Amino acid sequence: MFPMLTEFINYGQQTIRAARYIGQGFMITLSHANRLPITIQYPYEKLITPERFRGRIHFEFDKCIACEVCVRVCPIDLPVVDWKLETDIRKKQLLNYSIDFGVCIFCGNCVEYCPTNCLSMTEEYELSTYDRHELNYNQISLGRLPTSVIDDYTIRTISNSPQIKNG
């Protein structure tokens, strides 16, 4: 008789323990119920990027002196700088500058170490294409400034910082 009683007590304790675990899980679920949704409707709503966001690189052809510092500091030797030496003025003349964003890791070293500040990071992050060769940008494509997310009237911008209610 006692083994049956101890099994019944163990069964009761296990039932109470299981109910407690289910209750704890339910309380965690309820604590998340009052939060705002994190997902956004992407093509119609976009997050405003942070101030120091590292997006597509912008290049100013007139400022570049073809020193190739950007190539030396890049961990994957990505920027392609073509230049020729002008013997009469003893300076390099930049012919072509290109970056393949299919390979770029957006580390920002090229922007940080550029002595003439001809490179800068933009807030553009939509670089998807159907052909990877379209991600190879030359100096003309790199010189294009993107449309700011805030200035685009066709979409609703959402700040990624939490909303603080006054009052």
Swiss-Prot record:
InterPro entries, A to Z: 4Fe4S_Fe-S-bd (IPR017896), 4Fe4S_Fe_S_CS (IPR017900), NADH_quinone_OxRdtase_chainI (IPR010226), NDHI (IPR004497)
GO-annotated biological processes: photosynthesis, light reaction
Reported cofactor(s): [4Fe-4S] cluster
Cofactor descriptive note: Binds 2 [4Fe-4S] clusters per subunit.
Location in or out of the cell: Plastid, Chloroplast thylakoid membrane
Entry keyword set: 4Fe-4S, Chloroplast, Iron, Iron-sulfur, Membrane, Metal-binding, NAD, NADP, Plastid, Plastoquinone, Quinone, Repeat, Thylakoid, Translocase
Known catalytic reactions: a plastoquinone + NADH + (n+1) H(+)(in) = a plastoquinol + NAD(+) + n H(+)(out); a plastoquinone + NADPH + (n+1) H(+)(in) = a plastoquinol + NADP(+) + n H(+)(out)
SUPFAM superfamilies reported for this sequence: 4Fe-4S ferredoxins
Domain 4Fe-4S ferredoxin-type: 55-84, 95-124
Annotated binding of [4Fe-4S] cluster 1, by residue: C64, C67, C70, C114
Binding partners and assembly: NDH is composed of at least 16 different subunits, 5 of which are encoded in the nucleus.
Function: NDH shuttles electrons from NAD(P)H:plastoquinone, via FMN and iron-sulfur (Fe-S) centers, to quinones in the photosynthetic chain and possibly in a chloroplast respiratory chain. The immediate electron acceptor for the enzyme in this species is believed to be plastoquinone. Couples the redox reaction to proton translocation, and thus conserves the redox energy in a proton gradient.
Family the UniProt entry places it in: Belongs to the complex I 23 kDa subunit family.
Protein name as catalogued: NAD(P)H-quinone oxidoreductase subunit I, chloroplastic
Gene: ndhI
